[in-house]
Amino acid sequence: MPLATAAEALGRLDGAAARIPDVDLFLGMYVRREALLSSQIEGTDCTLDDIFTFELGAHTAEVPEIDVKEVVNYVAAFNYAIHRLDSLPIGGRLLREVHAQLLRSGRGSDKSPGEFRHSQNWIGPPGSTLATASFIPPPIKEMGDALTALERFIHQTAEDDRLHLLIRCGLVHAQFETIHPFLDGNGRMGRLLVTMLLCESGALAQPVLYLSTYLHQHRDEYFARLTAVRVDGEWEDWLEFFLAGIAETALDASRTAHQVHALREDLRGSLQEAGGSAREMQLLDRLYLQPIVNSKWIESAISVSQPAASGFIRRLEQLDILHEISGRARGRVYRFNKYLDLFDRPTSGPADDTTLS
């Protein structure tokens, strides 16, 4: 039953995303949410607001830039992976290319981005050594053989209806984490690999599943289930956990898709009733791409003057669409609360023990 429930939920999500007009306006938020939660599993401490503020160019010193860059790099890796699937199958070459994007700057950029490891690594709490590690991935020769076998499994089972896609995803994720082929970034790559498999297969036309929400909420169990697979071969328990995560997050993402569509229709109606111009309608749509803005961004985004941008901001404030959040008299920053709040649900905060880097 867990498989049937997860498959049905995923189908609903794909259908819900297909029914959203101009779905490309909203994909960035789904991608950023997955990037944020996947990075938080590894200990990154920032929020969706921090990401969009950084991308706006208005980042402050209150949040370490290295944490924000880690998520921004994940977004770049995510987008790169989905784009490259059009021309390259999932395999060693694509994984290395995506990894190079993931660790292109900041934390981990000194850990051989884009290269499989040439030395032994291990999994354990911060400060652990090879002698005290909770798990030691295969040495280099065996690692290469295991990667070859994993790639063969991905390709051979793609056309085999006897093994359901979601079971394949769960098996591939756990095996990739066990192989741990990179010096850093394995956890994030393993979770991204699930989305890549779903999109490559056509089960998801758009990358709108944020599985890391579930994995973050159940982080200790997530790590424990993976450990049980490695140590005791507890594959069935792992797959049951994994499928429950697919079902829960797919249903949540479907609800969010419906809420996004309803919000857009409601706000467009409100702006039209208030006599909004075509440029203001254009700005409203752009806010789904960048929900934290300033006057300078608006001027550039819809090619208007500074006075016009200020007038649009006042109108959107009056309609309860934009809210000033900087508290400054100059260089003010505005937040699209109703949209961000659909995705910016509270989480348990940064990690503090074992990581799957």
Residue ranges and their predicted role:
Residues 1-357:
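FIC/Doc superfamily catalytic core
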